[in-house]
């Protein structure tokens, strides 16, 4: 695993408290405050060694997400119901904003399909909330569409620990982002950068290195005027505007990124034949509910009985797509599998071959 890559299903181990037994652990400390309660992360009034805190870099971000939202200026004076109403009304603006960038998302989808068909990969690079959304999207694709593990790789600034708590200064590590990209990106891959502001150094470092390696690049952000738009293959700038809580991009900006990622990865799977009609036909049945869903999918797609669907699945050793092609075409399971192999795993293509 590369430094920032997050493997699905592998949360970091709890961190031992320094003054505790080796085997004990403690809940995550709120970002910015040490576990011993002595003050700020830089020492401050609670510093025990008397040294002045080290100076840290300060950046004033110029982004629409950093502006104050006129609809929430009295947020702290509102009732709980009114706070929720303001948030909900602002959230309703996000889907309309995503609608305006559908053409750009479509171009990114075609780039991903081309890369995956050529045996290449799709990488997500992000920091903070944006990076966590990339991890979430990549992790959901295998159980939903039975994608090979290597197809989608998520890289999070600060590594796996950053899924659960903020890793200080990780997003500012432009060199780290570039080095991580150089360690895993190949020519022909697609690299998708996720950054609410459009200027996160870790993400821009990865995108720049990926371009140098011969990979196509996409940037998804909440600033349509981001300077980085000029340096990527596809720029997806969703105009979400100021947040209800100023600068809290875990709100509308993150919602927009989630909607874009939902559409992007789902459309890629549709183009690659992982969906028939609007049914998941490559899903992995990892529990009783999903095994029941496989039966329902066959019944819905073929209008057969549950008993026939169960028998077809048994004959196909649980291979839903092979069972589906067999039922729709009337062919034996072995012939259905052969037709799928010859049609790039596309159900409609396999049925056409068997009909011919």
Language-model region placement:
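Cofactor-/ligand-binding subdomain signature composed of acidic, glycine-rich
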Residues: 2-5, 44-97, 101
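Intrinsically disordered, low-complexity terminal tails and inter-domain linkers enriched
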Residues: 4-54
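A short, well-structured juxtamembrane/interface segment
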Residues: 100-117
